[in-house]
């Protein structure tokens, strides 16, 4: 599946992973989660992954628990 991966622990748990460096950092984050590739999306504000496993949680507006 495709989507925005989320921070798994800490103060920003449930938030999108911010794209603070470049496409390579997002690609690495996605591959750690067994995705095919990742890149900066939405005006370079968040990482977006393609090809994630079905059980990987991704950020959705409806289930947003981010409270940075």
From Swiss-Prot:
One of its GO terms (cellular component) is extracellular region. GO terms for molecular function: sodium channel inhibitor activity; toxin activity. Keywords: Disulfide bond, Ion channel impairing toxin, Neurotoxin, Secreted, Toxin, Voltage-gated sodium channel impairing toxin. Expressed by the venom gland. It is found in: Secreted. Disulfide bonds join 15-66, 19-40, 26-47, 30-49. SUPFAM superfamilies: Scorpion toxin-like. Pfam families: Toxin_3 (PF00537). It comes from the Eukaryota. GO terms for biological process: defense response. Its main location: secreted. Residues 1-67 form the LCN-type CS-alpha/beta domain. Has the structural arrangement of an alpha-helix connected to antiparallel beta-sheets by disulfide bonds (CS-alpha/beta). Beta toxins bind voltage-independently at site-4 of sodium channels (Nav) and shift the voltage of activation toward more negative potentials thereby affecting sodium channel activation and promoting spontaneous and repetitive firing. Is toxic to both insect and mammals. Induces paralysis in Acheta domestica crickets, but does not induce death, whereas intracerebroventricular injection into mice causes immediate death (at a dose of 0.05 ug/g). Belongs to the long (4 C-C) scorpion toxin superfamily. Sodium channel inhibitor family. Beta subfamily. This is Beta-toxin Im-2. It comes from Isometrus maculatus.
């Amino acid at each position: 599946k495709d989507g925005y991966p989320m921070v798994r622990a800490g103060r920003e748990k449930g938030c999108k992973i911010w794209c603070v460096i470049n496409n390579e950092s997002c690609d690495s984050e996605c591959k750690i989660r067994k995705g095919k590739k990742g890149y900066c999306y939405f005006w370079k504000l968040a990482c977006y992954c393609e090809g994630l496993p079905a059980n990987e949680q991704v950020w959705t507006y409806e289930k947003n628990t981010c409270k940075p």
